[in-house]
């Protein structure tokens, strides 16, 4: 039964028994599944969605290593099998879902207005460009994913930008990325977006992201480099939107790094200005809302639009993810990139490569650091400490200037399985076969090598 006044069904302990939940209109099934465990969710009646993406009726979805929720607007029955850390049913008193739906309706009207006037070529109007900001654990990513899913259900093709290097949108952590979403997302994937592009088949249409390499976890580790990467992805996005009226009229949804009280607003302002944002959404962060409102009051972006700053409350369904959980997520994404997941098994290629055939770059140490943001230096000899690191393969020539290499798009990633310093050889794991010396490789500072993929 519900707890009086809260509309909550008490949390149940971890269980592997089959059970059924009946969701009344606007109720949510909230659950947490650890890495190594899994649950299977089947919608047996009604309609329900995970972060905006609808579940198909009588289709079993298996999820592992997630903290998430299933929302039903009109009522549903869910059949659950497997082990959860905890689970509960909540609602319908969480006003955040209604606020999110109202925001979507406003954005959709803006998209439709832009689409009606998109016959003017590159000068045609843009759809809404929305930046979502807030502290760690406020639900930024969940809101962006939900808005993107709802947009695709109307036939729109929004550009989704992940400016938070801590996770990775359809790619590995330590990157900034962007992708056009015009088809359904993968309900069963850990992040809810889908898997990174690979050489294997996919049950859900694959999205091909634009990826740029930061190689650090937090913005404050190298603000100048981070801003330079933002500039690079902004240029690539602008070119993509200029050539595609459907993408331009659908607008943009931007997930941002977590706001740190007192020192994070300048980065958010830089992102907003570079990507010509006209709507900023702050979640449960009054001080940030006040600062951004003051900063953009009376200010127009380069497209001549005023910038609106909107405050939303945090959903009660947002679950905290601790450091251990996030580390497991990062490790899982790396394993999945090379080896696939439970649904698709991939067979990466292992090569023994002469070090001198490769062009591997890294950032200079702090004491030698160039004044130029994003400086790189070529590594002159194989280093044993490179073992078990993931290197970014850049879309550039090996002898291009370091600045051009650093801010080039990423073509893919390789994994250093072993380093033989004496013989000057390296054992490299790559998702596809091919020469590795044709593209420069960049060795970042994160994600750190917590796992041995071949061990």
Swiss-Prot record:
Keywords (alphabetical) are: ATP-binding, mRNA processing, Nucleotide-binding, Nucleus
UniProt subcellular location: Nucleus
- UniProt main location, coarse: nucleus
GO annotations under biological process? mRNA 3'-end processing; tRNA splicing, via endonucleolytic cleavage and ligation
Family annotation (SUPFAM superfamilies) = P-loop containing nucleoside triphosphate hydrolases
Which parts of the sequence are annotated with region: Disordered? 112-131
Q: Which residues form a coiled coil?
A: none
Quaternary structure, per UniProt, is: Component of a pre-mRNA cleavage factor complex. Interacts directly with PCF11.
Cross-referenced HAMAP family: Clp1
Entry function: Required for endonucleolytic cleavage during polyadenylation-dependent pre-mRNA 3'-end formation.
So what family is this one in? Belongs to the Clp1 family. Clp1 subfamily.
Q: What name does this protein carry?
A: mRNA cleavage and polyadenylation factor CLP1
């Amino acid at each position: 039964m519900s707890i009086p006044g809260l509309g909550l069904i008490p949390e149940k302990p971890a269980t592997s028994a089959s059970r059924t939940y009946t969701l009344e209109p606007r109720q949510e099934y909230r659950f947490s599944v650890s890495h190594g465990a899994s649950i299977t969710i089947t919608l047996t009646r009604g309609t329900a969605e995970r972060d905006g993406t609808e579940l198909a009726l009588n289709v079993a979805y298996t999820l592992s290593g997630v903290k998430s929720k299933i929302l039903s607007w009109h009522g549903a029955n869910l059949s659950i099998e497997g082990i959860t850390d905890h689970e509960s049913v909540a609602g319908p008193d969480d006003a955040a879902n209604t606020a999110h739906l109202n925001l979507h309706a406003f954005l959709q009207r803006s998209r439709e207005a832009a689409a009606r006037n998109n016959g003017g070529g590159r000068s045609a109007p843009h759809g809404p460009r929305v930046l979502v900001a807030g502290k760690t654990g406020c639900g930024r990513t969940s809101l962006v994913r939900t808005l993107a899913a709802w947009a695709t259900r109307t036939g729109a093709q929004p550009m989704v930008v992940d400016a938070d290097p801590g996770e990775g949108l359809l790619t590995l952590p330590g990157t900034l990325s962007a992708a056009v979403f015009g088809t359904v997302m993968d309900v069963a994937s850990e992040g809810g977006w889908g898997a990174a592009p690979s050489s294997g088949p996919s049950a859900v249409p694959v999205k091909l992201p634009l990826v740029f390499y930061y190689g650090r976890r937090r913005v404050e580790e190298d603000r100048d480099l981070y801003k330079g990467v933002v500039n690079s992805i902004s240029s690539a996005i602008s070119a993509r939107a200029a050539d595609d009226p459907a993408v331009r009229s659908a607008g943009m949804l931007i997930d941002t790094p977590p706001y740190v009280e007192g020192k994070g607003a300048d980065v958010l302002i830089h992102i907003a200005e570079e990507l010509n944002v006209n709507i900023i959404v702050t979640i449960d962060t009054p001080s940030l809302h006040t600062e951004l409102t003051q900063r953009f009051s009376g200010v127009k972006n380069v497209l001549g639009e005023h910038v609106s700053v909107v405050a939303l409350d945090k959903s009660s369904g947002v679950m905290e993810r601790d450091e251990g959980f996030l580390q497991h997520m990062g490790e899982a994404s790396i394993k999945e990139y090379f080896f696939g997941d439970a649904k698709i098994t991939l067979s990466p290629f292992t090569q023994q490569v002469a070090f001198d055939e490769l062009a591997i770059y890294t950032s200079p140490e702090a004491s030698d650091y160039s004044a130029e943001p994003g400086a790189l230096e070529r590594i002159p000899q194989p280093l044993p400490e490179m073992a078990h690191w993931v290197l970014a393969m850049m879309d550039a020539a090996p002898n291009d200037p370091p600045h051009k290499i650093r801010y080039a798009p990423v073509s893919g990633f390789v994994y250093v399985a072993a380093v033989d310093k004496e013989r000057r050889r390296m054992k490299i794991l790559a998702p596809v076969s091919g020469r590795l010396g044709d593209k420069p490789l960049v060795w970042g500072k994160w994600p750190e090598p917590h796992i041995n993929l071949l061990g």
